């Protein structure tokens, strides 16, 4: 989507503002602009306020405080991860910017809270999706586990997830699955919203793994991701909040869902991390661990419905 957006911006021929919400995304755009267009972009954020270049990449946090200064400077505005537009910080920028062309980019047009209904108000009704030949259709492996997800509604949801995440047997299952797919030649991404689970699984996996959570600064994250790209490491344990969007590591080809997901847009975003084309890349695989219990079964059926809707092949194995 980065490449496509730059091609559109170049064709429109307008001074362009690209709005992002993380340093990782900003760096990604900087690199792609230089690689694709051969120019240096301007930066708004991290103490910089560079508005002279024909393309400027801005962090939303900084831009929201200075939008009145640049509201009439740009003919095109591109909002990356545009599903955030329902947040006032993002929508305020779009509302105040007088750009003729407003483009939103996202891996999904759905939000679990239903706020995707406002997307048309900001970006119109034209929707363009990449052709299937631009990515590799993954297969899904469902792993039947004997670990039980608590069903009692009297127990807070967070504690129910923790009961699974901190279960030593479950941790070993996750680490084992990651190692198995790495042994098959995959670069494996294991995602969870429980940092302790990720750290423990990384320890169990050993020297072939790294763990990226919000505790690491951007420089350290980049160094660890580079180890995956170069083949120094094969397994990446990453927090859901970081790898749910805005991360491009084309070498990744296997996704292990380490904690239950009941959010179709998030699931689609996570799968998007492993399906990008790369020469020599084998067919991506989504490893979905099915737990015991009524709640877990209901969520598992919902995920399976997503896979079927997307046309993914599904196979079931016992752990």
Describe the residue ranges of each PLM region:
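Conserved helicase ATPase core of P-loop NTP-dependent helicases/translocases
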Residues: 27, 40-52, 189, 199-200, ...
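Conserved interdomain linker/interface between the two RecA-like ATPase lobes of SF2 helicase motors
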Residues: 129-188
